A protein has these predicted regions:
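Structural beta-sheet core signal
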Residues: 5-6, 33, 51, 81-84, ...
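N-terminal beta1-alpha1 ligand-phosphate binding loop
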Residues: 2-27
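Structural motif
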Residues: 47-48, 79
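A short, aliphatic-rich alpha-helical micro-motif
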Residues: 43-44, 75
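A short, well-structured beta->alpha microelement
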Residues: 29-41
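FMN-binding flavodoxin-like domain, especially the glycine-rich phosphate-binding loop
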Residues: 25, 29, 57-174
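Acidic/glycine-enriched edge-of-secondary-structure segments
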Residues: 18-30, 48-58
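Structured loop/turn residues at beta-strand edges in well-structured enzyme cores
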Residues: 2, 44, 106
């Protein structure tokens, strides 16, 4: 059975939650779950590497970008998959085009979106809290009449997408 590494970075905890949900669905497999800065994050000893991160202000969270840059040559020899969390899941394809090189995207067995969250209380800085509150209010208030915009919903973590991704991993790890 192949060894799987799930490596991620999180700022507000949403990516950690999603990574843990994925990990929990892989019982019976040899899986390591860790952050990008952990010693176990070295992908050399693994067959399959899953990299997760969030989109913040249109960019991949910096620790994940740094991890991809540092380990690019090693990752090129592995089966890799990616998951993102973002406030606007409908834009995930656009985000992947911006955050991965063409080669990274082509090599991936999956480019998934695990949804996202906009929870101002989880934000660390006052600026982030303010931006999240404005974005949530924009979605919920959406117009002059105060009704929720019909074309937008508050994002949540997608357990369905996580389950699909876990299914792919189970097949690959045989």
């Amino acid at each position: 059975m192949k060894k799987i590494l799930i490596v991620y970075a999180t700022k507000t905890g949403s990516t950690a939650t999603a990574a843990q949900l994925l990990y929990d669905r892989l019982t019976g497999r040899e899986v390591t779950l860790c952050t990008t800065d952990a010693p176990e994050a070295d992908p050399t000893a693994y067959d399959i590497v899953v990299i997760g991160g969030c989109i913040r202000y249109g960019k991949l969270y910096k620790p994940v970008r740094e991890y991809l840059q540092k380990w690019d040559a090693v990752l090129a020899e592995k089966q890799t998959g990616y998951f993102l969390l973002c406030g606007y899941p409908d834009s995930v394809e656009e985000y992947y085009e911006k955050v991965l090189t063409g080669e990274q995207a082509e090599r991936a067995f999956s480019l998934a979106c695990f949804g996202g969250e906009m929870v101002p209380a989880h934000a660390k800085s006052l600026w982030d809290k303010l931006v999240l509150k404005i974005e949530r209010d924009n979605i919920l208030g959406g117009g002059n009449n105060g009704d929720q915009r019909e074309d937008m919903v508050i994002p949540t973590i997608s357990e369905e997408n996580i389950a699909q991704f876990a299914g792919q991993l189970k097949q690959l790890s045989l």
